[in-house]
Amino acid sequence: MHTLNKYQKALQNHPFNLSDNQVTENVNQIILENFAENNHMNTYKLLYSCLDLTSLKTTDTREHIWKMTQKINDLEGSNPEIDNIAAICVYPNFVKTVNEALTANVNIACVAGGFPSAQTFLEVKIAETAIAVTQGADEVDIPINVGLFLNEEYEEMCDELTEIKFACHEARMKVILETG
């Protein structure tokens, strides 16, 4: 008899069986039912304050990241009714650039952990994460290893995430699915 582990039990207890069309229909229904009550400036302000300004292009340079950061610096205080964006998100090698250029009260986020596919050595993921945090990252976005997940190697996947989280120290770690 096959015994389910805690991950299999959790997935079994929370099945997701909607098609893409059903998800789209449900989202459209939620928007239709709630649009009027949320179509006001306070909602827009909240949404703006949740945004991460992100640059994850293969052509990114220190100069480009510096200029992008400067635009956020220039916006700070320009409209006292609107809070800053949540963060500037970059590749880990640009965290130091953002940290040096940033004067606005905005967090620094980065992708790490073998982004986008998580297909590298655990030691590389840990080192990349630790260096990014040391250079000023407040948040680190880590992709799950989809191969481990699909192969139902949940324990190994979670162990990896736990070790990477340890490398984050006080920085927030956000686990992401890279689907694009």
Model-predicted segments: where are they?
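Short, surface-exposed connector motifs at secondary-structure boundaries
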Residues: 75-84, 171-174
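Active-site cofactor/substrate anionic-group-binding motifs, chiefly glycine-
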Residues: 79-135, 139
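Alpha-helix-loop-beta-strand connector modules within alpha/beta enzyme cores
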Residues: 92-114, 152-179
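Electropositive phosphate-/nucleotide-binding environments in soluble metabolic enzymes
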Residues: 41, 58-66, 92, 126, ...
